[in-house]
Amino acid sequence: MKYWFKTLLPLLFPLMVGAQQNNTSPFKVIAFFIDKTEDAHLSFVHEANKWLPVFGRQNNFTYDSTTNWNNLNDTFLSHYQVVLFLDARPEVPAQRAAFKKYMDNGGGWMGFHFAGFALTPSDFNQDWDWYHNEFIGAGQYKSNTWRPTSAILRVEDTTHPSTKRLPGLFKSSPNEWYRWEKDLTKNPDIDILLSIDSTSFPLGTGPKPYEIWYNGYYPVAWTNKKYKMIYDNMGHNDIDFENGTNKELSFQLDNEIQNRFIIDALLWLGGRK
């Protein structure tokens, strides 16, 4: 028996070391964004590109970003375990097909705020049924609050790896909140992770009456159980448009609890949770 073990050990050792290295080597994240967007979205993009590399060094993942959406192809995506859409979606059919294939094959994705937006007619028509109706599941954008304001968020699924370290209720950074066409609570494939708690109402300051919400149920972050994905409606910083200074008044990632959700979401998507 001892001879058998000594003979087999040299053969097993490289496999053991390889498995250990695979468990400890960083997973790779690639973020796509557009450089022509409104200041509030671009502010979040700049913030993400500043801080997500820091979060990566602290949590064992690498972070790259690009404005070249032609990189949504099989060869490029094969180098990454997680894809982020910071402020947009792909518009070219070949890019969309490559992204769908990536997700169908088990890739990870997290989309923020405007990455889920579609409205017909607009510059971003709802012309991608799989993405908006099946994958994200929310359909078209319907309305939003204004100005960007903080909300009290409720953790709806306390067992999901992205939410386990969160308190049951927490205050978000100021954000422009979206209402959607479809009722996600009626979709059995959707697991709602975060929602706006009723103590947040009235939410928004107007000046238009419909920009202030007084009641209702509004999902903020969710996952589609058929895919390795999370959509997060947060991603719109407050900007001083009214006075014409365009000064940044708030930052999404200036919130330790909110950052904890993003980090744990990425770790789950990267296969580490």
Positions of the model-derived regions?
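Bacterial Sec-dependent N-terminal signal peptides
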Residues: 1-24
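Extracellular ligand-binding/catalytic regions of CAZymes and related secreted enzymes
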Residues: 22-28, 43, 51-54, 58, ...
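Helical hinge/lid and interdomain linker segments adjacent to catalytic or ligand-binding clefts
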Residues: 23-119
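Short, solvent-exposed loop/turn segments at secondary-structure junctions
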Residues: 36-37, 71, 90, 116-118, ...
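Extracytoplasmic/secreted proteins, especially bacterial periplasmic and envelope-associated proteins
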Residues: 47-51, 94, 98, 130, ...
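Polar helix-capping/helix-linker motif
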Residues: 73-74, 160, 251-255
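A glycine-rich, often tryptophan-bearing local segment used as a flexible ligand/cofactor-contacting loop or short
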Residues: 89-165
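Catalytic beta-strand/loop cores that center a nucleophilic Ser/Cys/Thr
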Residues: 144-231
